[in-house]
Amino acid sequence: MASVGKPSLEDARRGTGSPKMKARENAKDTLCRNVTIYGRCRYEDKGCAFNHDPHKNSNQSDNASKKRFNVDSPSFTPSLLPSNGSSPTSSSSSLKKSSTISPKAANAAPFQPRTAASRSNTSTPGVRQDAVAPDWSVAEAQEFIPQGFDPTHMSPLHGNGNPGVASANAFDPFVSTPNPLAAPGAVGPVQANPFSHDAAAATLGGAYYANQAGFQQPVQYHLYAPIGPHNQNALAYQRNVHDLFLPNDFREELQKKAAATLQTLPNTQLPAQVDYFHSLVPLDLNHQKNAAIFGYPSWVYKAQSTKDGSYYALRRLEGFRLTNEKAIRSVQAWKRIASGSMVTIHDAFTSRSFQDSSLIFVTDYHPLSKTLAEQHLSAGGPRFQARHNAHVPEQILWGYITQIANALKCIHSAGLAARIIDPSKILLTGRNRIRLNACAIMDVVQYDAQRSVADLQRQDLVNFGQLILTLGANQPNVIHNPSKAMEHFTRAYSPQLKNTVMWLLGGMQKDQERNIDILINGISSQLMSTFDSALHLDDQLTSDLGRELENGRLVRLLTKLNFINERPEHEHDRQWSENGERFYLKIFRDYVFHQVDASGDPVVDLGHVLTCLNKLDAGTDERITLVSRDEQTCFVVSYKELKKGLESSFQALLRPSRRPH
């Protein structure tokens, strides 16, 4: 009877096979190298013992890795212990293994590859797939969702294996949803696009910008913008390209205003025609009805006139019924007022184009203008709520006081009263450039209210003081707590400005005479400062206009050259032949625009073009060498001779032809 103990060395050697034979037995689980290198094995049907199915190998490796690294796998329990003195090989071959398994192994889920079912259903025994199908698909991968993001605001992604149904709140940056401002209550909440580059514009959406007519190309204001820093070491006679054109910020501002003026809104529910105006575009940033100022909800639109083709701003009072025709005739007096500090009023009429009775006021349109409430107060809209509102500089407030006093001087001199001096109704059309707006509306709406003009003019002074106090104290509602607002105002500004505001707030008191002329006399020192700033601005604009004068001269030269060169009637003219006296004008065009470098590449140098054209316009004595295209003719001429030939050739074109018809 064999004793149970450690097996002998000979038995261990006899039970262990050779490594070569063991490798041969496991060859069916090893992927053939020909499949890895060439994609197929030519000896697959000729006795190659290796595996030729890459999916089988990957599945087995995944299964083996899961068995090795799974912490929840059942513990190893040998089915039968070898007897004492017997080898494991002999005892395992003679005895029957136990078929019992552990409880953990019984509860383990069976391994099933993801693509096994698809391969078994689609593949055929006689056809072998050369292309390796991936073991995973994009649809099965979990989509990355940032923390704190509401997935209901985004539509499911389509394409790339991500099926989904578009929701009603889907975000599309290239499609503008029509916004029926005729029914403001129908406006829904704005959804946010977390992948937008501009976080503020994406969060606010339509509340930040006016509705666009789909995707638009950006304005091409960068065509002449200088690249890189300016060369401060340039000599006095040296010029840069940007010295000959408008400043970049000024050109950008003008082109943005031009783009805003030409903006349209297709597929809108606004009326196509309102009296003699068409192409209405809403200008309101807040789509909620507000009747606090006029007593009626008001809306502002941009429209084009069919009479002169110009663009105007239409202010509509919703639901207004005209009971007295004399009320609307009061606008005629406002049409005669021409002040640079007031928005000009052109017309007023009633209309039913909006399916109701509306009163329309026609005024000048100032593109990209903002109100003082939007510029300085957080109550101007959600666009300005996130910005820290600092105190308005005192010099800017004095500029506002000067301009409003100028407008009130013109209005009061005409025997009228502004009646509305509110931050939400004063337009900021430029840099610290303001204009009173919506002045004639109250004369029509409250025509039956009998108040003297002197009383209304004194009320203008009170409203004027409340406006400056509101801007200085940075509090929209100073009427509710004027003492606290004045306390903040006193700490931030000089005594002269404080005394001016106090004098305006006491405009209704009868203790002394108060009118706009007395106010202008009191702020005369600040008027001189504002007037001096206006003169400096005039000098700057004149200098910028002088730069554009250079462009006009160069355009005239280019026009003359193109009128003269390459005319078909000059093909057989001796003066334009290769030996003619005007042939050098054709070669000069190649010298300016068609130069090439040593490699034969075109030379695109704006500085060279501007230099040559300026010398041609001046007619200098500098000589240049002009070579024909076939390099057989060469001219050495001066710019003076070129200018003389250009003028004589152009005058010859203007003379009537003497050829018989």
Swiss-Prot record:
Keyword Zinc: yes
UniProt cross-references to SUPFAM superfamilies, sorted A to Z: Protein kinase-like (PK-like)
GO biological process: mRNA processing; nuclear-transcribed mRNA poly(A) tail shortening
GO cellular component, one term: PAN complex
GO molecular function list: ATP binding; poly(A) binding; protein kinase activity; zinc ion binding
Biased composition regions of type Low complexity, renumbered to the chain: 77-104
Entry comment, domain topic: The N-terminal zinc finger binds to poly(A) RNA.
UniProt function note: Regulatory subunit of the poly(A)-nuclease (PAN) deadenylation complex, one of two cytoplasmic mRNA deadenylases involved in mRNA turnover. PAN specifically shortens poly(A) tails of RNA and the activity is stimulated by poly(A)-binding protein pab1. PAN deadenylation is followed by rapid degradation of the shortened mRNA tails by the CCR4-NOT complex. Deadenylated mRNAs are then degraded by two alternative mechanisms, namely exosome-mediated 3'-5' exonucleolytic degradation, or deadenylation-dependent mRNA decaping and subsequent 5'-3' exonucleolytic degradation by XRN1.
Protein name per UniProt: PAN2-PAN3 deadenylation complex subunit pan3
